[in-house]
Amino acid sequence: KVFFEERFEDGWENRWVKKD
């Protein structure tokens, strides 16, 4: 499952695509 995280405060690395 792939989803985008809208966490700009955490930084770009965390905002990139995360694979679950």
Curated annotation (Swiss-Prot):
Keyword set, alphabetical order: Calcium, Chaperone, Endoplasmic reticulum, Glycoprotein, Lectin, Metal-binding, Zinc
Single GO MF descriptor: metal ion binding
PTM comment: Glycosylated.
Source taxonomy: Eukaryota, Viridiplantae, Streptophyta, Embryophyta, Tracheophyta
Subcellular location: Endoplasmic reticulum lumen
Keyword field contains Endoplasmic reticulum: yes
Principal subcellular localization: endoplasmic reticulum
Lineage top rank: taxon: Eukaryota
Keyword set includes Metal-binding: yes
GO cellular component: endoplasmic reticulum lumen
Family, similarity comment: Belongs to the calreticulin family.
Protein name per UniProt: Calreticulin
Annotated function: Molecular calcium-binding chaperone promoting folding, oligomeric assembly and quality control in the ER via the calreticulin/calnexin cycle. This lectin may interact transiently with almost all of the monoglucosylated glycoproteins that are synthesized in the ER.
